[in-house]
Design a protein with these regions (language model features):
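Short hydrophobic/aromatic beta-strand element in the GNAT-like acyltransferase core
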Residues: 40-44, 54, 76, 192-196, ...
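Amide-forming acyltransferase catalytic core, primarily the GNAT-like/NAT-type
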Residues: 128-220, 227-231, 235-240, 272, ...
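Short amphipathic alpha-helix that is part of the acyltransferase structural core
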Residues: 1-59, 66, 73, 140-179, ...
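Active-site/acyl-donor-binding loops of N-acyltransferases
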Residues: 123-142, 226-387
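Conserved acetyl-CoA pyrophosphate-binding loop and the N-cap/start of the following alpha-helix
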Residues: 83-95, 228-232
């Protein structure tokens, strides 16, 4: 564990000063990470007794268009510079993906330190983060709602229940067990607080996780199941008007905040957040909920994958009228072509087939693109986790 932590700190240049700024000491990190690492699949290369390259995969679950998938959360990726360009990481990633395949983890998420690098290995962007800044005078005015907001402890069951209710109907969301919650809070300071919106039936319908420092109200995340919850939570934020100069926060949906505000001239910055990768295409499609149709549908194409052999070659994708998909390998050349990166971002709903064809990421007929547009749900992933 000490070598794992030392390698990550060296590669990502984490200093003692940076650790102490959020209240961490070296030994505390090791203790905090130990329960998570016990459940993780950690593999590495050693030079004698020295760990020189490593990856870790957390066993997780995610919701994809109403279905629960086992997911491998890739993290802890690092190689000492003197051991780079030896192919060590490529082989570790290949082994990690093979291990995921054996465990039935048909999709992999990661937070990238280098988008180009992971694209070369088969991952693609699947979600965004919108960072915003709202001046105190731009905050929404109080509006009456049937529920109320109560502050709770960040480790409370109320907070976990609120997230679970939200995640179960939210495409892309990680279903958080203790491992996922531990990772979610790991790098936050002790000043982080939480408030939950309860509806008129006393059910939790949303929360805001925040901290206040130097006259700034920082929002780590805000989730809500309906408009009443959204309004109630912003009422709570606006109630801090006399204490703050501005609000800074992040949101992980594809809906910019500006349109919802009376004074919409706020600062918003959209940036890529998580990347994803289909691990086993045939198995992924077997569980995937396509849209129903009055007709059966099919598509023959060549799939390209830079790492996983099981995803390389020609396939026939059939989609039944009730939306059940099946992918089978075929032994014939196909004119249509798509990479595993593009297949992932398309089936996850981050980018639409028509757009991907327009920019040359899919080679297929207009009829096929129209069929895919009709077959794939229109919803972009929400991912607010970090691991």
């Amino acid at each position: 564990m000490e070598q794992y932590n030392a390698l990550l700190r060296y590669v990502f240049q984490v200093t003692e000063q940076e650790l102490s700024s959020i209240g961490w000491q070296e030994r505390e990190i090791i203790r905090a990470k130990f329960p998570t690492m016990e459940k993780a699949d950690v593999i590495g290369w050693f030079d004698d007794d020295t760990l020189v390259s490593q990856v870790a995969v957390y066993p997780m679950e995610v919701r994809i268009f109403g279905k629960t998938y086992a997911m491998g959360g890739l993290t802890g990726v690092g190689t000492y510079p003197e051991y780079s360009n030896m192919g060590l990481m490529h082989r570790l990633l290949e082994q990690a993906l093979k291990n995921m395949k054996k465990k039935g983890q048909h999709i992999c998420y990661l937070y990238p330190y280098s988008i180009p690098y992971y694209r070369r290995k088969g991952w693609e962007i699947i979600s965004d983060k919108i960072s915003y800044e709202i001046k105190d005078y731009q905050l929404p005015k109080n509006r009456q709602v049937p529920g109320d907001v109560r502050r709770v402890k960040t480790d409370s069951e109320e907070l976990k229940e609120t997230y679970e209710r939200y995640a179960m109907h939210t495409h892309g969301a990680v279903l958080r067990d203790e491992l996922a919650w531990n990772e979610y809070w790991l790098w936050d300071s002790d000043d982080v607080m939480a408030a939950v919106y309860y509806n008129e039936k006393n059910e939790p319908d949303g929360y805001v996780i925040y901290w206040i420092a130097n006259d700034v109200f920082h929002i780590k995340d805000m989730i809500f199941n309906n408009e009443d919850a959204r309004t109630g939570l912003w009422n709570f934020v606006s109630a801090h008007f006399s204490m703050i100069d501005r609000v800074e926060g992040d949101t992980y949906t594809d809906e910019p905040l500006a349109f919802l505000l009376e004074d919409a001239s706020i600062k918003e910055v959209i940036s890529p957040y998580f990347m994803g990768r289909i691990v086993d295409f045939e198995a992924f499609v077997e569980e995937y909920p396509f849209r129903p149709s009055v007709l059966d549908r099919e598509w023959k194409f060549t799939l390209m994958d830079p790492v996983m052999e099981c995803n390389q070659g020609s396939f026939l994708l059939t989609i039944s009228r009730d939306g059940h998909g099946e992918a089978k390998r075929i032994m014939e050349p196909c004119r249509d072509r798509i990479s595993i990166q593009t297949m992932t971002t398309m089936l996850m709903g981050y980018k639409r087939p028509e757009y991907l064809a327009k920019i040359g990421r899919i080679q297929a007929s207009e009829w096929t693109i129209d069929m895919l547009e009709d077959a794939i749900e229109q919803q972009t992933p929400y991912i607010s986790d970090y691991f």
